[in-house]
Amino acid sequence: MPHPYPALTPEQKKELSDIAHRIVAPGKGILAADESTGSIAKRLQSIGTENTEENRRFYRQLLLTADDRVNPCIGGVILFHETLYQKADDGRPFPQVIKSKGGVVGIKVDKGVVPLAGTNGETTTQGLDGLSERCAQYKKDGADFAKWRCVLKIGEHTPSALAIMENANVLARYASICQQNGIVPIVEPEILPDGDHDLKRCQYVTEKVLAAVYKALSDHHVYLEGTLLKPNMVTPGHACTQKFSNEEIAMATVTALRRTVPPAVTGVTFLSGGQSEEEASINLNAINKCPLLKPWALTFSYGRALQASALKAWGGKKENLKAAQEEYIKRALANSLACQGKYTPSGQSGAAASESLFISNHAY
């Protein structure tokens, strides 16, 4: 029989489990502010703002220093490497700012998607080289969890068995390396919403992908209580002509998770996948109201679905700081309610609340 070497000690396991529970405590979710320099460039460009280090710092500071109303809503913040080492105007490093508000600091550790030879345009994710050393350093610098994104696409012949297996294995290797360094891995196998497939097809593919991911995590001796899953919601493809209700999306999503995700997993933090801000909140709420047994915390790890209205309200102008923070706070409060199944759509939406945030073939 296989034995895990080196095994995690009971102390290491407790630390990992405690961190995971803090991130997804009731009413809390994750702010994904880990856009790479290239991705944040597109966001800044959309508001006519130059992609300088100072503008990136100022914008992240705007989010991280929103007033204490967000404290009960945000359990963790995922940062990009650069942001982890930036400081607020008052001289405090951003990790300190996040911790002072009760949040856990996270770091994106993958190095982006690369083509997977032998497939029809499918990808794997790079960044395992030197990952252990980077994790050790990030832990010293205040990060307690990490994120790694793999991408799968639904097509007539995709995802292929090869792409599913390769991505599941790379996620498992990453997760194992994180845990050896005291960092909770967020496992993100994103199935893109591109395509004209219906809800059933997305559910089927999601089940196959998640089953492969948890088999790989078991093979690599990953301690599930010290992990979080960041999956897509089960939705029809963006080009699907058939409409499905929020309840149908919720039922398909929870069913897929119940069939594949062990109850030992601490929490599921959904990605928003280009849904509008309002849609992402409504679907999360429906998922939490779904009348099936759900043994994990079901919450959010949203990027654009927490930031779109705030970004628009800021518009690159310092004097719009407060207005932008109000928009961010509004979404944080909405999603905090949604992850408890208590959200009622207000209709008084933000600057971009109902705009689709879909970007085809989305690469961070």
Curated annotation (Swiss-Prot):
Q: Which residues carry this modification: N6-malonyllysine?
A: 111, 312
For the modification N6-(2-hydroxyisobutyryl)lysine, the affected residues are 99, 147
InterPro entries attached to this UniProt entry: Aldolase_I_AS (IPR029768), Aldolase_TIM (IPR013785), FBA_I (IPR000741)
CDD domains on file: FBP_aldolase_I_a
Q: What is its EC number?
A: 4.1.2.13
Please indicate which residues carry the site annotation Necessary for preference for fructose 1,6-bisphosphate over fructose 1-phosphate.
364
Q: Where is this cross-link: Glycyl lysine isopeptide (Lys-Gly) (interchain with G-Cter in SUMO1)?
A: 42
Single GO molecular function: fructose-bisphosphate aldolase activity
**Keyword annotations for this protein?**
Acetylation, Cytoplasm, Glycolysis, Hydroxylation, Isopeptide bond, Lyase, Phosphoprotein, Schiff base, Ubl conjugation
Which reaction(s) are listed as its catalytic activity? beta-D-fructose 1,6-bisphosphate = D-glyceraldehyde 3-phosphate + dihydroxyacetone phosphate
Q: Where is this cross-link: Glycyl lysine isopeptide (Lys-Gly) (interchain with G-Cter in SUMO2)?
A: 42
Pathway it belongs to? Answer: Carbohydrate degradation; glycolysis; D-glyceraldehyde 3-phosphate and glycerone phosphate from D-glucose: step 4/4
Subcellular location field = Cytoplasm, Myofibril, Sarcomere, I band; Cytoplasm, Myofibril, Sarcomere, M line
Record's subunit section: Homotetramer. Interacts with SNX9 and WAS. Interacts with FBP2; the interaction blocks FBP2 inhibition by physiological concentrations of AMP and reduces inhibition by Ca(2+).
Name the protein family: Belongs to the class I fructose-bisphosphate aldolase family.
Specify the protein name: Fructose-bisphosphate aldolase A
Q: Which gene holds the coding sequence for this protein?
A: Aldoa
